[in-house]
Curated annotation (Swiss-Prot):
Cellular component per GO, a single term: extracellular region
N-terminal signal peptide: 1-26
Something else known: Not found in venom, suggesting that it is a minor component.
Keywords (A to Z) from UniProt: Disulfide bond, Secreted, Signal
Compartments it resides in: Secreted
Residues excised as propeptide: 27-42
Protein name, as recorded: Venom peptide 5
Chief localisation class: secreted
Length: 56
């Protein structure tokens, strides 16, 4: 019974580590991609606001 609980806790820990590494790499990697998509969205999407400053 001890080995089963040890294996279960090890698997849970492994899943947590994998998801944490995935989140960290997702945060650190696509910065230029996010900037490019934000720029493309700012260029192509018409502004919702009707202020003159927002329309420029």
């Amino acid at each position: 019974m001890k080995t089963a609980s040890f294996i279960l806790s090890f698997v849970v820990l492994l899943i947590v580590i994998i998801t944490w590494i995935g989140e960290v790499s997702a945060v650190s990697e696509p910065e230029p991609v996010a900037k490019a998509t934000a720029h493309a969205a700012a260029v192509h999407v018409p502004p919702i606001c009707s202020h003159r400053e927002c329309r420029k």
